Structures are given as C-alpha cells and as structure tokens.
Amino acid sequence: MRFVDEYRAPEQVMQLIEHLRERASHLSYTAERPLRIMEVCGGHTHAIFKFGLDQLLPENVEFIHGPGCPVCVLPMGRIDTCVEIASHPEVIFCTFGDAMRVPGKQGSLLQAKARGADVRIVYSPMDALKLAQENPTRKVVFFGLGFETTMPTTAITLQQAKARDVQNFYFFCQHITLIPTLRSLLEQPDNGIDAFLAPGHVSMVIGTDAYNFIASDFHRPLVVAGFEPLDLLQGVVMLVQQKIAAHSKVENQYRRVVPDAGNLLAQQAIADVFCVNGDSEWRGLGVIESSGVHLTPDYQRFDAEAHFRPAPQQVCDDPRARCGEVLTGKCKPHQCPLFGNTCNPQTAFGALMVSSEGACAAWYQYRQQESEA
C-alpha cells in the first residue's frame, strides 16, 4: 500500500536500528539510567508495542508513556454525569465507542444502556446532529471528548447546528488541550522525562510552534513524529542526535502531514466555538490549569450541562490503581498491582485498560505473555 508499506519496510527498519545503536553509543546515558523518551500519543504507544520497537532500542534508550489518550484521563465523576444525563427518558445520548466502557462510580455508559438508557455509538458528531434532526421530539446529546485533534469536527458540527437552528441538539464537553498538560508534567519535580515524541495528529491542528516552550523553558528536545515504524525510529534518532549535540529544540519529522503553523482553518473553527482557558480534572493527574474547554457565548444554548443541570460529581480514584503513575511515565502498566487481575480488558478497572489507545490495553495485548513469564 503506497505511503504505508514504505514506512514499514523491514530492511529499512533494521538499517535505521543499526544507525540508532551506533548513535546511542555516544550518549552519556546508561542501561541503568537510560535516555527516557516520552511518547505522548496513545497511537504512538500502540504502534511501539505492535511493532516491538521498544524491544529494538539500544539498552540506554527507553520509551515511557505519557497522557496522550483522552479517554484514559476521563474522570470517574464525568462518566457518572454522562450516565445521569443519559438516564433521562427523552434523551438519546451519543458518544464514540471508546467511551462506552470507561467505568465511573455508577457504572459505565454501556451498563446504562443495558439498564434501558438510549445510548448510541456514533463515528462523528455530525452523526449525532443528523439523529437530532431525524428525532425532533427527542433531546440528542453528543458527548464530545478528545484533544485538539477532534475539536475541529465538534466545532464544525456546532456551527452547522447553529446555522440550521437545531433546537434539540446538545453538547456535553470533555475536550481537553495538550499543551498545558505537557507544561504540568515538566513542572513536577523529578519527572524523569528527557525528551518528547509529540503526536502527529494533534500537531496537524496546532502546528509545531506551540511546543517551543518545552525547548526554551525546560530544555528538553521534542520531535513531532508519524505513526509508522520508520517515523518513530527516525524521531528517536533525531532526539538522540540532539542529546549528543547538547541541543534542545523542536523538530518536525512528520512534515508530509504536519505544517509548522498547523491547520489554520481548524484553529479558526475552534476559536469560534470554544474558550480554551478553563481548568479541567484529569483522571489520575488531578486538576490541570488552563487545560479545559468551554463553549463561547454564541454557542451556550447547546451546553448539555446548562440544560440538564446534573449534580456535580467528585469521585476519588482507588488508591490501589497506579493510573496516574502510568500516565506520567513513572511506572510501566504491568507494575500496577491490579494489572491483568482486577483490571483486564473484560473487567477494566481503569480507563487505560478500556481505550484502544491506552498504555495498559497495549501492554496487555502485546506484552502480557512476557509479563506472566
């Protein structure tokens, strides 16, 4: 397949691995204290495990997993609010498939559906808007979540709902922004992060300039990378080269997709519909300043929380779970005492095991047999 196979060619992968090993031999990092590269994107995490890239790295270079999966950082209280809204008999509650099994204290949306709530999986917010137009006597609520990657499609859908004057369409907002989260990670003492592989999809929207503070303020190199083996390995080589040269700058490996300025039309749609300045709670990480998203005044009438006025939900994470440590790269999934036992894909305890982009789900799928051995 053109534009895919060439980025997975085994011969080129092995050549790049050999080049990486040669370059890494010049690093001051050791097997005991390797160069820790945080891959921020859940798509990167799954690609790394699927293709076994973590096992091909030199012993003095290591991947650590970051909070790049928006479903994985859904607070339990927000799921409980979703369940409460979905339980209204006049509501059709729409969301993406990944969110269906995320557990809250009052159960998941899938369990709410089993109890009789009208909860439906959609593939796009436009599908939810179409449902609203087809069911004028029902109240259709779209549960929007994700980083800047999915915000433009939500914004355009709300623009369409406003233009068409759809009165029975509502939006429950759980969009969050990536940049404040990276800053919050780096402000933690002893964060152990030496470099970043930044997500291609988010960067396609926000561009590369948004990351400059990581190099200038925190002196960490960052490379925006694609999702195929050669993309990721080339990104690692670029980071190793920066470390050898004692440089800290932002580089773009994924130039075939990501312009440095990002997608200006997408940014305009986001700015029209969303205020990107509120605080937001992240599961396992607490409240992160300025990472939340709210509707602008012109779109307030679509706000599901303002319309249904659900009771505020504050649910503490179980102290046995190490979700927050996995999300910040401080431990590996299999080091959590619940991993593979209480928490598995069939009976997930945490969202990291539920989402198709979660680090725990990836580890369970691709590394579980090794952990048991």
Curated annotation (Swiss-Prot):
Pathway: Protein modification; [NiFe] hydrogenase maturation. GO terms for molecular function: 4 iron, 4 sulfur cluster binding; ATP hydrolysis activity; carbon monoxide binding; iron ion binding. Transmembrane segments: none annotated. The keyword NADP does not apply. Keywords: 4Fe-4S, Iron, Iron-sulfur, Metal-binding. Fe cation binds at C41, C69, C72. Monomer. Interacts with HypC. Forms a complex with HypC, or HybG, and HypE. Belongs to the HypD family. In addition to the iron-sulfur cluster, contains two additional oxygen-labile iron ions. Involved in the maturation of [NiFe] hydrogenases. Involved in the biosynthesis of the Fe(CN)(2)CO cofactor. HypD may act as a scaffold on which the Fe(CN)(2)CO cofactor is formed. In complex with HypC, accepts the cyanide ligand generated by HypF and HypE, and also coordinates the carbon monoxide ligand. Required for the formation of all three hydrogenase isoenzymes. This is Hydrogenase maturation factor HypD. The gene is hypD.
